[in-house]
Each structure stands twice: as structure tokens, then as C-alpha cells.
A protein has these predicted regions:
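Alpha-helical metal-binding/catalytic segments enriched in His/Glu/Asp
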Residues: 1-23, 147-154
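Short coil/turn connectors at secondary-structure junctions
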Residues: 9-14, 37-39, 94, 119-122
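Metal-dependent peptidase/peptidase-like ectodomains
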Residues: 27-97
Length: 173
């Protein structure tokens, strides 16, 4: 809600979706994908922080207070590389920390948007979270603030031309 209230960009129509049943088939993402038919999708999610004892920090490289994570792939999703580059540039431009992660055994809602209606440009950003899927988790306020700033700046500067460019690919003969 905070993000939706702060982005004022007449060039885009912004939808905020809170989805359900990600863990059992991305069902909420399926419903919103079919109803909204978005041009570009930015999934905001959480991911395991591997900076606590007992967690494999190779498998889970994200650390609290090192910035949000950009998911490079999961078992159902592969991000649009132009969106990845645009978000990396936005982070650099705003001097914001950004980590990178992958997930071989889980999935974000991005996987559903990858395949709906011929596929949509999608990218997933995650807040590193300790004790994910427990009765309480822990995030860093600095990571939250960096994520909010990154997305706000990205959406505020988004144009129809940029949105169209995310879907344009050069055909190789």
C-alpha cells in the first residue's frame, strides 16, 4: 500500500496484487495474471536469508542488511533480462545495495506470469528473511527501505516506450 500511494506516474497503470497459494501451484498469481493481463510484472517476495547458523549460505546467499535480492531464476521462472538490467541500473543510479539469488527447489509467482498469455516480462525482487515459513520471520528495515526506494524510482521513471522495449527481442536468423 505504501508503494502504491507514493508512485505518481501518468504513463503507467499500476496494479498491486496480494496473491495466495503460491506454495501449492501459484494459484493466486494465475488468477491475477488472467484477469489483469499485465504488460510488465515485478514480483515482490521474500527469500531465505542464509546468514544464520544451520542454513546453507551457498544455497541461500542472501544476508540481512545487504539490500534486497534480485531472483535470477527459480524452478518455474526466468526473468526478463532487460528488466534485470534496468533494475540493476536503477540500483546503481540510486546508490542502493542489491544482492542476487537463485532458487532451485522453490518458486516465486513470477513463474505463472512467465507463461500466461504467451509470457510477460517479469522480474522478482525479494526481501531476505530469517526464519522464513516459521511462525515469525525477521527482515531488515534497511533492506525494506532500499527495496521501496528501488521500486518507487523504477516505476516513477517507467514510460510506455520502456515497457514496450522489455518485450522486444531481436530475431536471430
Amino acid at each position: 500500500a505504501e508503494l502504491l500511494q507514493t508512485v505518481n506516474n501518468p504513463e503507467i497503470t499500476l496494479y498491486g496484487v496480494g496473491s495466495v497459494e503460491e506454495e501449492v501451484g501459484l494459484r493466486g498469481a494465475q488468477t491475477s495474471a488472467e484477469h489483469i493481463k499485465p504488460d510488465v510484472v515485478i514480483v515482490l517476495d521474500t527469500a531465505v536469508a542464509g546468514d544464520v547458523p544451520g542454513i546453507d549460505n551457498i544455497k541461500y546467499p542472501l544476508k540481512l542488511s545487504n539490500g534486497p535480492g534480485l531472483m535470477l531464476f527459480d524452478k518455474r521462472y526466468f526473468p526478463n533480462q532487460k528488466l534485470v538490467a534496468a533494475l540493476k541500473n536503477c540500483a546503481v543510479h540510486n546508490d542502493l545495495p542489491l544482492q542476487f539469488c537463485t532458487m532451485k527447489t522453490g518458486a516465486t509467482d513470477g513463474g505463472r506470469y512467465n507463461v500466461m498469455g504467451g509470457g510477460r516480462p517479469v522480474v522478482a525482487l525479494c526481501l531476505p528473511t530469517r526464519y522464513l515459513h516459521a511462525n515469525s520471520g525477521m527482515i531488515s528495515k534497511a533492506d525494506y527501505d532500499a527495496l521501496l526506494t528501488l521500486i518507487k524510482d523504477f516505476l516513477t521513471t517507467l514510460t510506455a516506450e520502456k515497457v514496450n522495449a522489455f518485450s522486444q527481442f531481436r530475431q536471430v536468423d
